[in-house]
Amino acid sequence: MSQPVASPPDQTAVEKSTMRKISIRLVPFVALMFFINYLDRTAISFAAPNGMNTDLALSAAQFGFASGVFFIGYILLEVPSNMALHRFGARRWLSRIMVSWGIVALLFTWVGNFEQLAILRFILGVAEAGFFPGAILFLSLWVPAKHRSKTLALFYLAQPLTTVIGAPLAGLLINQHGVFFGLEGWRFMFLAVAVPAIVVGILAWFVLSDNPAEARWLSTPEKTWLIAALSAERAATEAKNAGTRKPRGGLRTAFGSGRVWALSAVYFGFIYGLYTLAFFLPTIIGGFEEQFGTTFSVFERGLITAIPYLPAAVVLYLWSRHATAHGLKPWHIWLPALIGGLSIPLALSAGSPAATVAVITVTACAIFAALPNFWTLPTQFLTGAAAAAGVALINTVGNLAGFSAPYITGALADWTGNYHAGMWVVGAFMLASAAIMLGLARRGRADSGLPGAGTTSKILD
């Protein structure tokens, strides 16, 4: 008797099982790395109103400068770091980055003055350089384009959840004043949030795989499908690019692309709003006592700081699911920018703490709704070394806002005595992001000549 021939595995079932494993095995760990990354980066915002600014005699402008100078170090090594990741592999490079910044973050425990704080923030930026774009690039090397928006949404959930969990946690740690080795509460907080970076960074060496072919947790059919899907996408993108431009190196391709620079400008506006809230929201909430006559404990201020970010996490996920289900459109990006730009200037004119937090919540939801969808765009028209350079360049230009936002906001607060002017600047930059994204959408429709064009694929063709 002849033996029955085994039928090939159903491709739909293989695709589902592969993406399920990636969503369970890979994405949560990278999201955990991002959670710790954002917590260490913004821990200074929790320390500032809870003893650090007083102990170090910092003005609002000095605090803003120390917060923002992180991004100067970050920017200087951003592109080289991401090119190194492309060369050495994500497992080694992301692990190295994480352990490095964890060691630097520990040193904040013993900072003694403004100068030391600024120097450490700069070095922390150098140590962290390349992590975020490297993580984005790493996920793009694992996840086909049709699944990328949802995957990046799961990854990006770590950022608002960092504040949801991290702000109350920081309050609890700061309340341990003098309990551990006589350290002030804010110093102990710096110590406690730095250690996980070192531990998880070491674990990353063993948990991550550089590419699907090395993943022991994927079956042979799953590896075959995933490698074929990613290779087909890469070949299609390279063929399209080959027909429109002469072959160039990765850096030249990225730096010579008008689309990369336009997306960099869009990202700048979002990041300006993101880090203004990240670094100054705890201080703004601390000012409710003077503004509204309210009194909150350190832990209660942490809980209030977390309030805008829980709805933001929900909106982020639902907005990205909508984009995945119905196709990513330009308005998935420019509409949140428009809403955020119109809402944030009104926040500090509200007549109560509840109203102020409610308006800030709208702005936070707008910022986080757009970001995961935004990061699906660069890898639609860049591959290989050009993708590494392009993602890093966009993140670098955007992170100029990471320096300018806290410094300008702090300087304006010192000058005017409040944060109103700083919020108007946030609104202006976010409205500019909306306008640029609308311009890209119109260009896409004009170039395609098709009714209803202007999806992101047409924008970037």
Regions found by a protein language model. Give the residues of each.
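Cytoplasmic helix-loop-helix junction between adjacent transmembrane helices
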Residues: 120-157
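Extracytoplasmic gate region of multi-pass secondary transporters
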Residues: 45-46, 252-320, 371, 375
